[in-house]
């Protein structure tokens, strides 16, 4: 401060995380303003890490929604107290009372391995646990959703199979709210931490270990992005 008032900045500590996020291409994050987490969970690392507190039946959704196109993101199960009640997926009706209890809520449960929609639980895929990376591919052009564990598409899924929907978890309805959003939820008093990678190349502050093949829109993921899919970003939404 050259004014003589000594309003000087102090050099701070810490480590900077280099990301692709910029004004020209903003990446999705999780949304702490979501109506149904009720302030119970904590968010860090640019709202990409979600610490699920012990409150029951809560979920949060992402900041960007979609009604068409093909989208891919990853989320790492960092730690848990119980995988039984945690699930990943998408949601349209974000004012619902619990995850996947409506016709427009779709989830993949870790233990036991189940898919969940409209309160119906069906055995599907393999179990996942702490340390696993779950990939989500949503094909809104054909109304299909696919899930992978550590790069392996469950039920021999093929996100590029179009209307055939080979190995898809669900044929999803058109979003009643106009959009679907990425979601993480749980249904009982268990705790857990999830870190999302919407294409910035990090889970929390840890960079992906071996970046896969990206889509046409800039993004860095642990595993290959299925052909024709894009990261959930402002540039991707406007292509």
Question: What residues fall within each predicted segment?
Answer:
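PRY/SPRY (B30.2) beta-sandwich protein-interaction domains
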Residues: 1-239
């Amino acid at each position: 401060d050259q004014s003589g008032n000594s309003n000087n900045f102090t050099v701070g500590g810490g480590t900077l995380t280099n990301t692709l996020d910029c004004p020209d291409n903003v990446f999705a994050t999780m949304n702490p303003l979501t109506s149904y987490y009720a302030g119970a969970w904590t968010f860090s690392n640019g709202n990409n890490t979600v610490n699920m507190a012990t409150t029951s039946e809560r979920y949060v959704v992402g900041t960007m929604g979609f009604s068409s196109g093909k989208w891919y993101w990853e989320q790492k199960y960092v730690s848990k107290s119980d995988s039984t009640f945690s699930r990943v997926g998408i949601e349209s009706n974000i004012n619902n009372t619990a995850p996947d209890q409506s016709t427009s809520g779709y989830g993949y449960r870790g233990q036991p391995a189940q898919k969940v929609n409209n309160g119906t639980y069906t055995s599907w895929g393999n179990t996942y646990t702490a340390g696993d990376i779950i990939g989500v591919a949503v094909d809104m052009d054909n109304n299909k959703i696919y899930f992978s564990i550590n790069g392996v598409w469950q039920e021999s899924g093929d996100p590029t199979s179009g209307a055939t929907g080979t190995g898809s978890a669900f044929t999803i309805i058109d979003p009643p709210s106009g959009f679907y959003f990425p979601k993480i939820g749980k249904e009982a008093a268990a705790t857990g931490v999830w870190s999302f990678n919407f294409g910035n190349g990090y889970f929390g502050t840890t960079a992906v270990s071996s970046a896969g093949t990206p889509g046409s829109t800039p993004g860095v993921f642990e595993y290959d992005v299925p052909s024709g899919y894009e990261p959930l970003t402002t540039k991707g939404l406007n292509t």
